[in-house]
Amino acid sequence: YPSPKKAEERFIGYLLNTLRSGEIDVLFPVADACLKPIVDHEEEILRYTRIALPPRDIFTAGYDKGTTLRIAMENGIPCPRTFFPESPDDAAGIAEKIDYPAVVKPRVSSGRRGVRVCRDSQDLVQAYAASASEFGPVVIQEFIPYGGELGVYTLLNAQSEPRAVTVQRRIRSYPISGGASTLRETIKDERSREAVGIALRLLKAMRWSGVAMVEFRVDARDGSLKLMEVNPRFWGSLNLSILSGVDFPYLLYRMVMDGDIEPVPDYREGVQCRWLLPGDILWYLSAPKTWQNLKAFLR
């Protein structure tokens, strides 16, 4: 189909032509590039099918990292110290008072695109100019030293009540310095329960419905959880959630069709899933060549 990034109107036209058959019960947007065009044209699309996303005003709260962080700060959700520059002068002023390293992050982007770690004020001002030019509005944040990462994977009904939750921890990533996870594991412990409580409180404040992943980093300085972002769509490690006993796509389909579902009471812990090609192979090739790493990779 036409690229939603390079030819949005053609993409929407193609989509509407496909939906006019009346044979599609629910539209599931699963790629970042498709999300905003579909939300922007929701009135046209809703003539032919249902959309497995929250309404436009609520969707923006998860799609725009700046909006997410403002809601988090207003509701006492632990997150990095964050600034919202609106001009180069704002960025220069922030650069003089923030501690380093600091992070410049686009408010709307996928993965680590446009994210820059800055070592001094000159670096930050240059990073702001580059990111703002390519991606639009950005946030500037304190850097949180990496002590681990947890993801809370959720399905909420129209009243923002949880219907399914799983928690995963990141074991390996590529690049090692920070990137896509190559090995993850479902967990249940005191830290994961804390993360679930914080995530559900945030999503309630956002009035969220549908699926969302809430990402936390463990602050290596004190072991506390810090909100990194909310992913307003299905996540890359979705198969791990399904293998642990929670079929999020089917549950979301049933909820969109029926209005609500019974809560899923539990999931299996200790289930692992890895992205072997090329992710985990690249991790191994870039990791220190130790017996422990070889043994872990071959398990």
Name these PLM-found stretches.
Residues Y1-T18:
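Glycine-rich, highly charged phosphate/nucleotide-binding loops
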